[in-house]
Amino acid sequence: AEPGRQGDTSAATAQAFGSGTLAIMQRLRVAVVGCSGTGSVVVEQLARTGIGTLILVDPDVVEHRNLNRIVNATEQDAELRTPKVEVMRRAIAAMGTGTKVETLATSLFRPEAIRAVSKADILFGCVDTVDARHLLCQIGAFYLLPYFDIGVKLEADGRGGVEQVCCSVHYIRPGGGSLLSRGVYSLDEVRAAGLLRSDPTYLADQVARGYLRGVQESRPAVISVNMLAASLAVNDLLARLHPYRLEGNESYAAQRVSLSHDLFDHEADGAACTVVGRGLGKGDVEPLLDQPEFSEPS
């Protein structure tokens, strides 16, 4: 940003939440994993709100089929197969807000991505596979990082109508509950998602034998619902930096919205997760996260 311009772009945030909160935000390093339908909106909001540095992780490129939901992506990006993280970098640079950007056009399941994300202060997960969501919970535990998990679910009723439209935001604090302990997924589902990524043939065999359930690989996505979920998550972050809710933040460990059923509820954290909690505060270990999959060449 040009001299003097960054202060101008941040003035509204300071007016709403105070100069002290803005100063904290400008020092924060926030990792956003997943830069598609929900992640691109989160990135847009964080950059314009005044976050100092964004670490962006996504292995995919822009395609025509997702132009309906990736903020700042263009038809030319789809033609050129521009990496999604580069679309985000370009957009943030054009904003002139002064937000620094680090990008990794690779899978979170690469050691270099885990190391980059571990250097953040806060994690945002905008991914739809349970193994990636579980991995983010583990990274948060090992490196004592708070994690905001965003989920969006649209289901058709098979008759041309809609069964449900809903979204959720989970705040996972180190040493507390996890997505696993809250019942968002099971370890069998994590295993199945991992096999889909690493050995889909073996997964198909296990499903055929009845040992594992299949994995739904894609869901419909609508930008308006993605934006609702992203805004809920970013506002949750703001509430934790500058408390503004009538109820304390401890009552908002999980927030759920159903547009189809006209519901909004929130709840406090439950018992600590004994599975994810095994790595609490371990930090850098060999192999990373105590998992041979993430062994690095010496």
Predicted features along the sequence, with ranges:
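Glycine-rich phosphate-binding loop and adjoining beta1-alpha1-beta2 segment
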Residues: 56-96
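N-terminal charged helix/coil linker that caps or initiates catalytic domains
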Residues: 1-31, 252, 292-298
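Short loop/turn elements that flank and shape the SAM/SAH-binding pocket of Class I
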Residues: 109-112
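Internal hydrophobic alpha-helix adjacent to the cofactor/substrate pocket in enzyme cavities
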Residues: 227-247
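E1/E1-like adenylate-forming module used to activate ubiquitin-like modifiers
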Residues: 103, 114, 119-228, 245, ...
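Residue-level detector of anion-binding/catalytic polar loops
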Residues: 52, 100, 146
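Conserved acidic residues
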Residues: 105-107
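Glycine-rich adenosine-cofactor-binding loop
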Residues: 18-63
